Amino acid sequence: MTITDVAKAAGVSRQTVSNTLNSPEVVREETRKHVLEVIERLGYRANQAARQMRTGRSRLIAIGIEPDGDGISGSWADRFLHSLSETAAQEGYRILLYTAADDHAEIATYEDLLGAYKPDAFVLTGTHHDDLRAAWLLERGLPFVAFGRPWSDLPDARHPWVDVDGAAGTEAATRHLLGAGHRRIGFIGWPPGSGVGDDRREGWARTLTGHDLGGLQRAVEDGIAAGESAARDLLAADPGVTALVCASDSLALGALQAREPGRPVAVIGFDDTPAARAVGLTSVHQPLGEAAAACVDLLARALESPDAEPPSAHVLLPPSLTIRKSA
């Protein structure tokens, strides 16, 4: 299989196929997508080393994968990576995966990857306050996008990011419970200082305050066992609580186990994992496919037109509430 075979099958010139692979910015979007579809159908694989020598680019996007934890909380990452890989392939890029235990280890991995594979860009996940990774990449002018807000730099972030509005998600969950008649609604989240966790707690607290209501909360590390323990403690502290909003499906699954016979308690999770679907857990759904597409779009724009300013370098996506039998 050669580039000439692809050109014949696509009904375009050999140069158009070459441009699609090596200089996609000069090819009309409709033509580029058509050629990429033919390439995928034929199973054509260009000589990556030769292409990199010609263009100085690897067409690789590197992203770290996080530990799976209890096997539930990390399942959102699987869906995000799948969507990221699909979308990147449509733009002519491939995904390079790596693992790292913390910021320092991840920065060391960046140096190794840049020396061995020369990725064109990076996608950061698990963003947090005082993120050393973002600062390191910014100092060196390396293209990257974060899936997650740069919590220490808001609202004037210095780099592109894509995120899901966690506060909007827990607000929707709390409003749903209020609409069902609940007035004593507790919250089980993570210890303060987590940007994501604080954001999700804020949506619950803000909604209750707007209805002149208050509520108990518990903060624990993520996990089913921790969620069960926190729920038991909260329900014992306030026998009037009839509903719980949780910062993750792992915590919510634990809360379901903490319910006692004769005391119905509605429970809502966050992430809409396969486990939530299996047990009928109402959960906040994150548009991970849309988030992955936005990440690739921001990176592709930066790589194909380095001097152009993207229409919006910061994308905050709204979640939705998937209602099941638990609430």
Language-model features and meaning:
Residues 1-59:
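N-terminal helix-turn-helix DNA-binding module of bacterial transcription factors
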Residues 13, 59, 120, 183-185, ...:
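Short acidic/polar active-site loop segments enriched in Thr and Asp
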Residues 106-118, 227-239:
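Short, well-structured alpha-helical segments in soluble
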Residues 237-327:
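Flexible loop/turn connectors
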Residues 44-109, 205:
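Amphipathic helical "hinge" segments at domain boundaries
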Residues 67-79, 98-106, 162-172, 187-232, ...:
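Hinge/beta->alpha junction and helix N-cap segments in small-molecule ligand-binding domains
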Residues 125-171, 250, 271-282:
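Flexible loop/hinge segments that line or gate small-molecule binding clefts
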